Amino acid sequence: MIVVSDTSPITNLAAVGQLDLLRQLYRTIVIPEAVYTEMVAAGKPVPGAVEVQTLCWIQVQSIDDVQRVAALQSSQNNIDLGEAEAIALALELKAELLLMDERRGRVLGQSCGLNVTGLLGILLQAKRKGLIPLVKPVVDELIEKANFRLDNQLYVTVLGSAGEAE
């Protein structure tokens, strides 16, 4: 299974000590060079920066079609370089899944025919596979430690999907 990730699923999971969920769920994650650069050359410590440099199951790959990246960035969705490269790489590799949290990038990825899931979808899948006992404590920790933002309705919906009360 080819899975491409944008920055935020990696940094958020690393911030709460749950990065290994990606390996357990997908075995290997591919990130574009722009995502690697966002994390490693940020000028300040970023959760997951050391891991993307050292873990063999996170692979960095360059984009072949730079014109596609430019077209994605100039689209009306106003996405950043990391998101554009993640979408382009997922298309190039014919990835089964793109991991991305930013709404505009998710919408653009889906409009390109990609299967896209975000951090909350990852956590729901991890619970279904028995990798975490509960979603709520992880989401609460993401909100507290990683400044993860989600509205209350989505919070309630996710907990309902997980079979957990608020």
Where are these regions (language model features)?
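Acidic, PIN/NYN-like endoribonuclease modules and their adjacent C-terminal/linker elements
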Residues: 106-166
